[in-house]
From Swiss-Prot:
An example Gene Ontology biological process: translation
PROSITE patterns found in the cross-reference section: RIBOSOMAL_L35 (PS00936)
A Gene Ontology term for the protein's cellular component: cytosolic large ribosomal subunit
NCBIfam families: rpmI_bact
Transmembrane segments: none
Keywords, sorted A to Z: Ribonucleoprotein, Ribosomal protein
Organism placement in taxonomy: Bacteria, Pseudomonadati, Pseudomonadota, Betaproteobacteria, Nitrosomonadales
Keyword Transmembrane attributed: no
The keyword Ribonucleoprotein belongs to this UniProt entry's keyword annotation: yes
Organism: Nitrosomonas eutropha (strain DSM 101675 / C91 / Nm57)
Annotated family: Belongs to the bacterial ribosomal protein bL35 family.
A GO term, aspect molecular function: structural constituent of ribosome
Name of this protein: Large ribosomal subunit protein bL35
Annotated Gene3D superfamilies: 4.10.410.60
């Protein structure tokens, strides 16, 4: 059986936490920022957890994580 390949695009976007949950960075922070409020941009800075319905597909992309 050959080695499974990690999807490199997913490896750059997701990190597995110690408890097993997956964290990701927020979207909507790259451009068109003038119309967004300061509060909105500040809240987009942090990381968030991947939704439960998406965890299985992310784990399939990261077999060795």
């Amino acid at each position: 059986m050959p080695k499974m390949k990690t999807k490199k695009s997913a490896a750059k976007r997701f990190r597995i936490r110690a408890g097993g949950s997956i964290k990701r960075s927020q979207a909507f922070k790259r451009h068109i920022l003038t119309k967004k409020t300061t509060k909105n941009k500040r809240q987009l800075r942090g990381m968030t957890v991947v939704h439960a319905s998406d965890v299985a597909s992310v784990r399939a992309m990261l077999p060795y994580a």
